[in-house]
């Protein structure tokens, strides 16, 4: 079975990080998370502001997307540390890789240091032509 990477995490957010014995520790995500509680699920969230305008550049769009996710979570009584999964869709994988350091900084500033299970997928395009990234989020609020 697995062990929690941060024992204090279960006390504050009810989540257990699943890390198979002997596997290398992932950096910036979790291999799996176990949770019990109320499910909060977003649709595909893009990086536009309340006026429907996209920021300039990939990192700005990612930051706004993460801020938008936090706003949606709050509507359901969830916090960033309740996230159990993020699925990222990007139109340019090289753009993502080139900006890893800045993306990590933006992620930590918006979501903190909680890293849920994540997947990253490159797609041909997104529904919104100006969007460079779209993220689906799943959170579990402890009962």
Predicted regions: what they are:
Residues 1-84, 90-143:
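N-terminal presequence-like segments and the immediate start of the first folded domain
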């Amino acid at each position: 079975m697995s062990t929690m990477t941060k024992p204090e995490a279960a006390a504050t957010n009810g989540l257990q990080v699943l890390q198979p014995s002997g596997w290398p520790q992932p950096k910036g995500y979790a291999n799996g998370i176990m949770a019990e509680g109320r499910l909060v699920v977003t649709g595909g969230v893009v990086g536009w502001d309340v006026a429907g305008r996209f920021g300039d550049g990939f990192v700005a769009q990612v930051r706004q997307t993460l801020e938008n996710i936090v706003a949606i979570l709050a509507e359901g009584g969830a916090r960033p540390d309740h996230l159990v999964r993020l699925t990222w869709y990007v139109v340019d994988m090289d753009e993502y890789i080139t900006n890893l350091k800045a993306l990590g900084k933006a992620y930590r500033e918006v979501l903190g240091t909680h890293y849920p299970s994540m997947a990253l997928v490159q797609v041909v395009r997104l529904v919104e032509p100006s969007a460079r990234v779209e993220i689906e989020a799943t959170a579990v609020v402890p009962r």
